[in-house]
């Protein structure tokens, strides 16, 4: 129930694929070549993936919600994260399937993801998920 809602919200914050990045940079290069002036695009709010990145985000209190996979193979990789999240006051949840998290960030599997910034329309949905 809440896992599907979480994945729905997370789906909006997927990082761009290789093709999307190529197209974005190509469009920007064409604009620059047409001498329209180069304006760097504002960075969209996006999911951050991986144990090291997520750990840093939690330590700096930048993460708003941490999602941990339950089937990480050497479990020691993520076993410290719930304690760290509790200590830093960051909400966390454990979800079934590292493959589901991997699919969000265009990889095979992914142990942890973290929400950093969230668009205003999803603030309520995220707050509900944190509450549950």
Curated annotation (Swiss-Prot):
Ribosomal protein is among the record's keywords: yes
The UniProt GO MF terms for this protein read:
RNA binding
Enumerate the Pfam families for this protein: Ribosomal_L7Ae
What keywords appear on the UniProt entry? Answer: Acetylation, Cytoplasm, Isopeptide bond, Ribonucleoprotein, Ribosomal protein, Ubl conjugation
> Ribosomal protein as a keyword?
yes
What InterPro entries does the record point to? Answer: eL8/uL1-like, Ribosomal_eL30-like_sf, Ribosomal_eL8-like_CS, Ribosomal_eL8/eL30/eS12/Gad45, Ribosomal_eL8/Nhp2, Ribosomal_eL8_euk
The processes (GO biological process) annotated in the record are:
maturation of LSU-rRNA
Superkingdom of this protein's organism? Eukaryota
Location(s), subcellular: Cytoplasm
* Crosslink site: Glycyl lysine isopeptide (Lys-Gly) (interchain with G-Cter in SUMO2): 8, 36
Its assembly, as annotated, is: Component of the large ribosomal subunit. Interacts with CRY1. Interacts with DICER1, AGO2, TARBP2, MOV10 and EIF6; they form a large RNA-induced silencing complex (RISC).
Protein name as annotated: Large ribosomal subunit protein eL8
Organism field: Sus scrofa
